[in-house]
Amino acid sequence: MKGRAVRRCAWAAALTLVALIVWACRPLSPYQEELVRKGFPESYVDRLEDLHERHPNWIFEPLAVTDLTWKAVLDKECSPGWNLVVRSKWAPGVWKDKGYANYKPYYAKNAKAYDSGAWYQASRAAVAYFMDPRSFLNESDVFMFETLAFDARAQTRAVVERTLEGSFMHKATYDDTKRTFSELVCEVGQRLQVSPVFLAGRLKSEQGAGTVQAKGRIGDSLLSLATNAADRVKENRVWGGAFARDGAGTAAIVAAGAEVFNGYYNFFNIGACGTGLFEIRFNAFREAVSEETCRRYGGPWTTQAKAVAGGARKVKELYVDGGRHTRYLQKFSVSPQAGSKRWLQYMQNIAAPLQEARSTSKAYREAGLLDLPFTFVIPVYRDMPSAPSSDPADGDSVYSPSEL
């Protein structure tokens, strides 16, 4: 009996091997051959052909990352603080009904908390999963690779309004005018020749329900933090940088008063970084009034309109025009076109391209525009694994691959 069991296992293994060989040697379809000629590895072509069959007008172009290996990029992206996963119990969409979003599988072991304590370092497996383009070649998530040039056919005001849904800007007016944020974003996008749908998605990601940076109340927040003794405890995560060490900056804030810092806006959260809430918000204020902002980007940003228009121009110049012309490339800045600013990533939130892609594809779908000729630029790394990187949550997370 034992010998039979061994033989059965051997036969099963042999059949599996034969099946794998047959699959590997299967002939490619004409469209798959076209993709391979363009430069896509065979590990991409099945998923891309499936998308092509559903949307024949879609165009897929490879971005060859030939001067860096997959491992070299992964090592760099695993640097402390580069890729963070939210620490939250909030669950969007269908995950709200389940009662969880399951972010935990993406945390690094003994993960360090960042910023206000609401973010954890991503594990190496999580970085590999989010960095691997093959993880997201489906009808919804593929929009992280959409090019961000202006296209009046798809980027209508209705789509922009749908993209803003769930944020404080949805169907809302700005600066005590009767004009809506969607009107403003469309106007700015057309003027800059950059997708207003992309701009709307980025504004939603950065502001959501509305932060002090979007409401012109940065000073109130700074004064509150500066005068709260409990928040000034050494190593408290609401503090950061020099403010945590000597308090000199906080004394100046208290002496000046909140109104000195109120009335300034930073909708794209440009420069809003640091190791605590105080430092993050102070740096957001500093960007809004900086010499460069005033000289090149319509500053100081004393109105919501100025902050949206000026911030959008800076995003376009630094990112869209700087070799980062997809949502993916603004997180994983691997394009050779980026030159000396190759590693200049827009955000630390590892899931930002995925979140923006989903809100974008949803808006296009609801507007009946999914069959337009979108162009997707998808990175291909040198020496990347033969199979897609696995999802640390094994399909059971809001960050797992998702169709529309």
Question: Which residues are covered by each model-predicted region?
Answer:
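Structural recognition of the beta-strand scaffold that forms the well-ordered cores
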Residues: 198-204, 266-269
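Solvent-exposed loop/turn segments at secondary-structure junctions
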Residues: 205-210, 272-278, 336-339, 381-387
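Catalytic cores of eukaryotic secretory-pathway lumenal/extracellular enzymes that build
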Residues: 211-217, 222, 293-296
